[in-house]
Design a protein with these regions (language model features):
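PLP-dependent aminotransferase-like
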Residues: 35-99
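Conserved small/polar residues in nucleotide/adenosyl-binding loops
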Residues: 284-286
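Conserved PLP-binding catalytic core of the aspartate aminotransferase-like
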Residues: 237-267
Length: 286
């Protein structure tokens, strides 16, 4: 309908404003979540192109496993715990056409906010858990994707920010053809209308609140208070020790004595603070 077309155009304008989106980028809103991107992306890259996947946590590992099945020309770059800074300084990822990174590993609590830390100029970035929480540069970016439900809406719609130069002609079925999806203005099939409607409301609110600078300051302030407490009580807790890559979106920690973890989570639940046991693979996740 004309009304929905207007809604889509308004969201594109909001996202362009929020992210200061360059003119050579387009906005795509589709279904399938971030996991679907592990299928969509490798199927829309020339099989002769070499892809690398930087793995510094659980979600990056899942991406690598899926990419490798669909594009055997995919290399693994795996980082050991608390060694991301040194790894990025030593690796220039030469001979790669594209490098995939996960900006925020929610289970490990590790975050790459500055893409210039990564020595590659064609980045594919999973920003599912921190898109909308800080400003960043698109200079090295070919493609960004994120499920809206973490910071910018409700489940059902995935936000994709696409460098138009990344799009190529492929002989895939329609919904696996990234170029067709993008040029269809996100309506190749029936779009997730309510999720998109909510996304529009949230992006308008984010702009009125002060944009990405405001949300970055808020996340830094709140996470720093918690990290300060953990640092002061490091004899009690295990958590990320690599200061510059500590996640500002979610702080992950556990008690060194396991018996206290369940007690802490139960007392939080009793106080109305639910879900801090986070993902099924993590312990305490705030």
């Amino acid at each position: 309908s004309n009304e929905f077309d207007e809604l889509l155009e308004n969201i594109k304008l909001n996202l362009t404003t929020l992210f200061n989106l360059p003119k050579n980028f387009d906005v795509l809103l589709i279904q399938g979540g971030a996991t679907f991107q592990n299928t969509l992306l490798p199927m829309n890259i020339d099989k002769n192109k070499k892809i690398g996947v930087l793995v510094n946590g659980t979600w990056g590992k899942k991406t690598y496993e899926d990419f490798k099945k669909l594009n055997p020309n995919t290399d693994l770059f795996e980082v050991s715990k608390n060694n991301l800074g040194e790894y990025l300084e030593k690796n220039n990822f030469e001979n790669l056409d594209y490098l995939h990174i996960t900006s925020n590993e929610t289970i490990e609590g590790i975050q790459i906010k500055d893409f210039n830390e990564v020595a590659h100029s064609n980045l594919l970035v999973d920003m599912s858990s921190d898109l909308g929480s800080y400003p960043f540069s698109f200079d090295k970016v070919s493609y960004i994707y994120a499920g809206a439900q973490k910071n910018m809406g409700i489940p059902g719609v995935t936000i994709c920010l696409v460098n138009k130069d990344f799009l190529i002609d492929v002989d895939n079925s329609s919904y696996l053809n990234l170029k067709k999806l993008t040029t269809s203005n996100s309506v190749l099939n029936t779009p997730p209308t309510f999720s998109i409607f909510v996304l529009n409301l949230v992006t308008e609110w984010m702009i009125k609140s002060g944009g990405l600078d405001y949300f970055e300051k808020k996340s830094i302030s709140q996470s720093n208070e918690l990290y300060k407490f953990l640092d002061e009580n490091s004899n009690l807790f295990d958590f990320s020790s690599e200061l510059r890559f500590r996640s500002k979106s979610n702080v992950v920690f556990k008690f060194k004595e396991d018996k206290y973890n369940d007690t802490f989570i139960k007392q939080a639940n009793d106080s109305g603070i639910i879900g801090i046991n986070g993902h099924r693979l993590s312990l305490i996740h705030i």
